[in-house]
Amino acid sequence: MLAYNRAVVIELRTRLTKLFASLGLSRSASQLHVYTFSSFAKRVCGDTALSECEMNEWEGVLLDTIKKKPNDVRAAMPDLQYVFIDEFQDITQTRLDAMFGLKKIYNGLTFFTIGDKNQSIYGFEKKESMDPNYYYKQLYETLHPQKMEMYINYRSYPKIPEEANRYLPEDSRPPVICKNDKKNEPKSEYVYIYQDNRDWSKDFGGYVLWLKEQGVTDLAVFFRTNNEVYHGYSLIKALNLPGIRIRIQGASTCELYRMREIFAVLTLLDTECNKKIKLENNQTEYELKEKIAYWMSQRPNWDSFYMDFAFVLILDYLDFALTDEESHTYGDMADSIRKTLKEDNPQLYKLYDDERFQNRRILLDQQLNVVLTTMHKVKGLEFDAVIITPSVTSLPFNPTEDIDESIPLSPKDIEQIEEERRLLYVAYTRAKKYLFVYKGNRERAVENMQRFTSLEDQWGIRERKVGLDNYNIGFNARFKFHGNKAIAYNVRKNDPVIIKRYIGMDKIGRPFTTYNIIHNGSIVGQLSRSSSIDHRMRTNNIELLTGFFVSDVFYWSYQDTLDADKRKEKEFLKNPAKFNFKKPEPFATKWCEDARKQGYVFIVDIAGYGK
């Protein structure tokens, strides 16, 4: 069985083990092997073949092995009979070619795929085509599968999918509402569509009060981009509403295990890596719960949700260990959680709300959870109530270039806008009970298959691309390492920061300019020359920008820098022209001795619109 991330793999394995046990087929369950595509590559190719490759290159090595070394594949998996592919609509060409290659090696191999074309929203990651039909057509023509269809929607009250269906292609068969949802449908209105550029933030406080009265426990507010999430956060924060807990799930700059709060929990497990997990009387659970709860009380600037989220991941591992005959250590648990968090997977948040953990978590107070998130982060999730805000970003979406509305749409542009329609379909269908949609000019452009020029510059200067490259990590690891402890304990997620120009002199008297990130009067980081904010400030001779927020505090290790230096050296040897035939200078040499001894530094990640 092949799934797209480790969290789904774990969920599938757990569900199938329980299913087979209930059918009296526990032994048969041992013949099921559930993998991500990368772990499947590791099983087939082996550690040695992948040791010199980045994880994002593993699938290419897998395809190459299947094509050129079929005997090695058979040796790794001699009895392969069935392949199940989950979420087929998100397949890539490399993965599809690998599956077709397996069919040539194993003559009697049977495939089973499951997916929903209308939920294909990650086409921007694919090189060949964003259109899911491009891949389904190859599947149909190569394997001639029998097609079976499921249409019943078990999540939402009837009017919610009815509104969402407007974004489906004409030849799509819309889902059928299950009888219970029809039976329980409220008589009062529960879907509100505003077509008139109405300001959602002015309605927000009233919605919170009303939804609380309806017994709603979670409200999600959807945005198209990460910067729009933080713009929305600034509007909600200004309302100063009591009795709500705000959680931000924006676009990830790096893997979740790098977040300060989760890093601390994993480090706690690593320091006692050989300690045996004690399941009797929930001893390990209570010990770790007490420790993490103590941190919550003593570290007010840390994100309590993510500490609790890390604890829920511990609970999930302990439940797994309870069903496994092998003994487990704290180190095993840390490694497993770290692997799970390597993938940018929104479905991980489902674990937090899993009924198994609702009374075992640390945070149990009954506040309304308000989740601010990008639309790409909600696939597989569901919420009692959803607010969809209007976007001002470009269409087709291109964060690095401006859109000219006068140019006719190319076939690729059409594919991109069709994916935006699917994205709105997915967003609408996350709502179970209440849906509030605010439409602006961009949403009308999506509906009418038209271009739309970004209006984000009206809000301020933004980072056009999320990523670690926007920050000078060496600055925190050398010149500002003495401030690392302050970042660790004093910088709170969502705190305001400013960007300020600094003009200095180098050792031989030449002037230089940098742009520093300042939190409560102290420098906590520096933008790199890759940052689009840095570029705009230089170009427009801007000294100071306000309007930014701390989106995350994450760690970066000395080993990470050594590994990055090795990758760059390898890249240089392959393609020196990319570096103007000048060997790149290693960044590890720029770490000060104290930073090397500690082994890591904290980096402040920012988002928002600067003015």
Q: How does the language model describe each region?
A:
Residues 444-611:
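Conserved active-site motif detector
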Residues 97-183:
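Conserved RecA-like helicase ATPase core segment
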Residues 144-146, 152-244, 359:
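Helicase P-loop NTPase motor core
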Residues 6, 216-418, 434:
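Core RecA-like ATPase module of SF1/SF2 helicases and allied nucleic-acid translocases
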Residues 6-9, 39-41, 117-121, 127-129, ...:
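Conserved nucleotide-binding/hydrolysis micro-motifs of P-loop NTPases
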Residues 33-130, 152, 379-380, 385:
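Conserved helicase NTPase motor core
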Residues 1-48, 429:
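P-loop NTPase Walker
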Residues 399-401, 406-480:
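Accessory/regulatory regions of helicases
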